[in-house]
Structure formats: structure tokens, C-alpha cells
Amino acid sequence: MKRLLSLLCTAGAIAACAMAGSFINGNFETGDSSGWTIGGGYRGSVYNPLNPAAFLPGGALYSASIANGHSGIVTPGLDPNTGNQLNRVYSGNYSWRVEDFETVGGYASVISQTVTNYTDPNIFFAWAAVLEGAHGLTDAATVQITLTDLTTSTLLISRQYNAASGGGGVDPRFKYNAATNTYWTPWQIEQLAIDATLAGHDFNLSVLAADCNPTGHFGYLYLDGFGSVAPPPTGDVPEPATFGMIAFGLGALALKFRKR
């Protein structure tokens, strides 16, 4: 019995190691925004590019009602504005939708998370944007994605796109759905390798999505898989790493005692 308890403790230690790390709910598998900072506000009077900090709590354009009412958890399913070509979830059971398309009116929403003293070898995250086309580069619906090294104030990953008429605000990763006049991307996987010059630094991921400035066209983005391991694609509904390690540990115990 004591040996069994000892082995169970070992399995628990393995699980605890799986839980260790800087990211909090990076894959949204808690079914909510725990670990993240949520923001939102009205951008009808502001031109592109937008300042995400202005829409976060304490920012000049922050509105709690917009922050809490325009973004949220989504479950697997096809996005109608892409011609049902995009699954709303990249990996697992949930992702986060930044902004929406149900309430168009010149709104912007933001989600952000900071990780400190980061030492894992990589940072990954997945995103997919959906933008309704109209207007020019400075007033079209837009998305802005940044990963910043806070320790050195260095912008490491930056993605900024908008739905200006004619496709001038997007690049080849975007597709166009004529039926909804929408520019959209399949899921994009971002990776930052953490070498010796970055190990131990603090990093911030900030994602903004916004309707157009004239307030008549939507823009939103799905976010998933912020963590140290590349998220597996949709279709393979993975266990969170912690539960996978627990299952591995307990499975090994069962095999060990079955052989005795």
C-alpha cells in the first residue's frame, strides 16, 4: 500500500510539473477568460491604427459594457461569414472570439495576457481573422496582434490587417468570400523561439479586433492555443496537458500492478 501511495505521489508530481508554467488558461479550456485581461470600447471617432491599451481597463476609450458584451467563448462550429470554411475553434473545446458580427456599430475589443520570467523554449498561439470589406486603410474594420518583450520593450511579432476595399489591407494569407464581402484567414499559427537572449524575460500578447470607423461593417478574430507547445489542429480534440500527464502516470501504475 505504501508503495502504491508513493507511486501515486510520483504521478501527482508529474502532473504538477505539467501545470507549472507562465501561461494561464492560454487555450481557454476553462470555458472562460480566466487569466486574461479583457477590454473594449467605441472606435467610431478613431482611425487606424488603433492603440489597444486605450481600450483596456484604465484606458481612455474603455467601456466595461462593451468589453463584457462583445467578446466571449465560442465552441466548435463553422463561421457563416467565411462560407462555412472556418472552424471557430482551432484546438480543443473552446476558443475566444474578440469582438463580434452581431452588433455592428464602430466597436473595438481587446484581449491581453502577460507572462513573466518565461523560460520555455517556445511561445505559440493561433488566430483567425474575419473582416467585412469597405472603406480605406485608415477607417476599415481591422485586427492588430502583437507579442512584445516587456523586458526590452521590443516588438517581436506584429500583425496588422484591415478590410479596405479592393484588398489593399490584407496579404496572401487571407481569402475572400464574395457572398459576404468578407476577408478571412484560415487558422494562423505564430511561433516565437526563446533563445538565450530572451529566456527569463516578460512577454505580453495583445489582440485587438474592431468594426470600421464609419460603424457599418464588422471585424472580429478568434484566438486559441497561447502556450509553450504548438496546439494540435481542429479535429483532434486534445486533453489539456495536465490531464494527459495524469492519465499517463496512472496508466503506467495500472500496468505495473497488473504485471505483479
PLM-predicted stretches and their roles:
Residues 1-4, 239, 256-260:
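Positively charged n-region of N-terminal signal peptides that target proteins for export
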Residues 2-10, 242-245:
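Sec-dependent signal peptide recognition
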Residues 9, 135, 213, 246, ...:
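Active-site-proximal flexible loops/turns
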Residues 12-13, 249:
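Alpha-helical transmembrane segments and their juxtamembrane interfaces
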Residues 14-20:
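Sec/Tat signal peptide C-region and signal peptidase I cleavage site
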Residues 21-234:
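Aromatic (Trp/Tyr/Phe) and Gly/Pro-enriched flexible surface segments
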Residues 238-256:
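A short, hydrophobic C-terminal helix/tail in secreted or cell-surface proteins
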